[in-house]
């Protein structure tokens, strides 16, 4: 009987974790960028002010770094600074960001040598006319 309660308890905990991941993956976004082994897809994206981009892990351990260029350790000098923690869970939302200032935003994956292997991207944010 005790085993039954332990198993039921563990199933309940695992079910609640699954629901949290589903909620995280359902973040409203205008655009989605996939982050995989040394790539962001699409690598270059053009959006309007006020639109939201979310980055989804397509495999591996990745982040979204829009603060310091991982290749030269210089600031990107983006109109707004953004960055995320690294995520390993496949299919999980790495990061979601709503761009409020027009301009060109550069970012990379600062994990290991990912940026030097081509894991870089840009988001161009246009004003709404």
Annotated model-derived regions:
Residues 1-7:
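Sec-dependent signal peptide recognition
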Residues 18-129:
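Extracytoplasmic copper-binding redox domains, predominantly the cupredoxin/blue-copper superfamily
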């Amino acid at each position: 009987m005790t085993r039954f309660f332990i198993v039921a308890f563990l199933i309940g905990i695992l079910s609640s974790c699954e629901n949290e991941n589903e909620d995280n993956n359902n973040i409203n976004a205008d655009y989605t960028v996939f982050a995989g082994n040394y790539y962001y897809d699409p690598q270059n994206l053009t959006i309007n002010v006020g639109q939201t981009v979310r980055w989804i892990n397509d495999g591996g351990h990745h982040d979204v770094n829009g603060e310091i260029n991982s290749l030269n350790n210089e600031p990107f000098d983006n109109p707004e600074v953004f960055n995320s923690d690294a995520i390993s869970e496949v299919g999980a939302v790495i990061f979601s960001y709503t761009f409020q200032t027009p301009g060109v935003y550069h970012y990379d994956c600062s994990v290991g040598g990912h940026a030097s292997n081509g894991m870089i991207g840009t988001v161009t944010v246009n004003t709404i006319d």
